[in-house]
Amino acid sequence: MRVTQGTFCYLPDLTDEQIRKQIQYAINQGWAVSVEYTDDPHPRNSYWEMWGLPLFDVKDPATIMFEVQECRKQFPNHYIKVLAFNSTKGIESTALSFIVNRPANEPGFVLRRIESNDRVQRYQIHSYATEKPEGSRY
């Protein structure tokens, strides 16, 4: 199962040149760019690990691509994404986010039905990846 999170999630994986162009777009908008990674891509897991600090005031996409490559070397079997943060007053939110690396095998998710009181049906998404301990999931 292919994890679909962020911009471009339904397109084929971006090439490094396409990633560089998206980073250049973010820089042109004045957004701060950061790199994050995780081995638990659950849709509600919005707290991925940061790879270094956010890169404020960087004007060259090669600097950010270097950080992406270093993160890929360190975590080749993790999900890695690039985020662009718009710090404009009143917006102050992620403006762009896309996955730039994924494990070769994506185990996917299962939807579990849980019966509750008063015959209420609740549903829970469970990641197969979390059945293994952190650090050995892929």
UniProtKB/Swiss-Prot annotation:
GO terms for biological process: reductive pentose-phosphate cycle. It comes from the Eukaryota. It is found in: Plastid, Chloroplast. InterPro entries: RuBisCO_ssu, RuBisCO_ssu_dom, RuBisCO_ssu_sf. Keywords: Calvin cycle, Carbon dioxide fixation, Chloroplast, Photorespiration, Photosynthesis, Plastid. Coiled coil: none annotated. Belongs to the RuBisCO small chain family. PANTHER family: RIBULOSE BISPHOSPHATE CARBOXYLASE SMALL CHAIN 1, CHLOROPLASTIC (PTHR31262), RIBULOSE BISPHOSPHATE CARBOXYLASE SMALL SUBUNIT (PTHR31262:SF23). HAMAP family: RuBisCO_S_bact. Heterohexadecamer of 8 large and 8 small subunits. This is Ribulose bisphosphate carboxylase small subunit. The gene is rbcS.
